[in-house]
Amino acid sequence: MKKVRCSAVIIITLVMMLLLSSCSSWTFIRYIYEYHREYYEAEDFLPSGFASYESVKYDHDKKILLFFFTDTMTVKVKYDDFYIAKKNEVEQTYKFLTEPVESDMLEGHYLIPVTEFEYKGFHMRVADGGDYPHKFGIVGYNDDTKEIVYLWFYDTDFDYIASPEQDKEQAMIEFVENNFDGL
């Protein structure tokens, strides 16, 4: 009887180890795939180089809840005397939204409630060409500290930023506060 019980424990342990190792391999492969997909989607928005910068801060935050995830990237660049030239270059490189984006599905709800807003001393502008509100970028300037910040947001399950009863600018500020810890 003891041999049977011991054999059963060994078999169950081996099966569990096999299952756990196969899950971890799948998770690792999926992680690599997800990383490359997210990187290349954000690559079109995020800057590829920084000329004459004083410092660069990069923050990549991924929040996972069961099958849903939110992926955000923050690049904050501090410039010296080159700031004005870099700001003008960014203004010419990016196209920005000129009007809020309202939801076609949910009446009165805004995917992008405002195209420009102030946040922590930065004048923020929403970049044009995103898949609102699932995937888009924001660029911000702070003339006092000579900093430019690039925010990238990706969440396939996100529905809207502002409901009809919310203040539109405050909703956008709360969106940035809740999703971009690195700012």
What does each of the following model-derived ranges do?
Residues 18, 27, 31-32, 86, ...:
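Alpha-helical protein-protein interaction elements
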Residues 4-5, 43-47, 125-128:
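Intrinsically disordered, low-complexity segments enriched in polar/charged residues with Gly/Pro
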Residues 1, 16-17, 73, 105, ...:
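Detector for methionine-enriched segments
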Residues 23-96:
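N-terminal export/targeting and maturation segments
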Residues 15, 67-69, 116, 131:
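A generic structural signal for short, solvent-exposed coil/turn residues
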Residues 1-37:
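Gram-positive cell-envelope targeting signals
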Residues 89-183:
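Extracytoplasmic electrostatic interaction patches
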Residues 2, 59-61, 122-124:
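Short secondary-structure boundary micro-motifs
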